[in-house]
Amino acid sequence: MNFTRQDEILKLIVEDFIASGEPVGSNSLINNHNLQYSSATVRNDMMKLESTGFIEKTHTSSGRVPSSKGYRYYVEYLKNMKNLSVDEEFKREFQIILQKKSQSIEDIMNESCEILSELTNSATVVLGPDAASENLVSISMISISSTASTAIFVTDKGYVEHKTIYVKNENQLKKVNECVAFLNKRLIGTKVSQLVGKLEALKPILSDVLGNSSNIVMDSFIEACVKFAQSRSMYHGATKLLNNSEYQNKEKLQAALDLIQSPEKLRESIKSGKVEGFSQNEEEDVAVLSHDMEINGFSRGKIAIVGPQRMDYRTIIGALKYVAEELSKYYDIESEAEEEKDD
């Protein structure tokens, strides 16, 4: 990204407005940042930025504020920066989370969201992997007792779901395993979103072959597949939006809360963004910053920050990048350690 004088002025306008909430004028830019440009030059550049839609005039002040387009430009600029600073206390807290060896990736992402919410004073959301579009690659059974067995479902993107099946006796468990073997041959390669329909179609065939035992398997599998295809999400810090000065308008506040509580809406919002990992709804004054969390080459979902358009993008983007990079590094090291043990 070639950085011109207008780019510098736009960046400063966005940062000053984020910090103060007050419209920004040419004189305040020059005085606050010791700019070596004349007032006329800065005013002229601001007029050009306004005419191209990057900043806009408010009704109550002669200063200017960033438009949605201006925020997008600023976010793209930050995303291209290689060494954004990250709050040291946040880094320490995140490393403490990583040191809890017994935790799952999902637990780590959830705890990361809690401290991100505190750092950014915004709502944070963990979105689980979108498994519905993935293909099933295996179903395996692990016996846990003489009357119980756990079915493990795995997709081509490495996402895993499980369901424990309980029966009355060993003979019935044997029948259950036969059912699973039958289904394994017919379900592998099926999209997760199509599994329930395929299971329903196979019900009569399986019942003819294996009798009543098939009902136990089918009901358990259908429950697991419905759960598999659902969007999983956990959110933190929703109450922080209640105290945000940008959300005095109750309708705008409700729009932000609705987005946090609806994983499908949030996914759609993220997909609709003109800048990768950033989306906005100008009318409702809602912005979403998100980052993919990849572990060993597979997506484990996204962490998203939801708030008004006026939020601390520099801090948020730096923290999201840090979490993604540290998670990936941590699990790469864990994988290498496991491989060395196997050798």
What do these predicted regions represent?
Residues 19, 26-78:
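N-terminal helix-turn-helix
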Residues 1-11:
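Short alpha-helical segments that sit at the start of domains
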Residues 12, 16, 52, 73-81, ...:
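Conserved, well-folded catalytic cores of nucleic-acid-processing
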Residues 82-343:
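Intrinsically disordered, acidic Ser/Thr/Pro-rich low-complexity regulatory segments
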Residues 10-26:
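Short helix->loop/beta-hairpin flanking segments within DNA-binding domains
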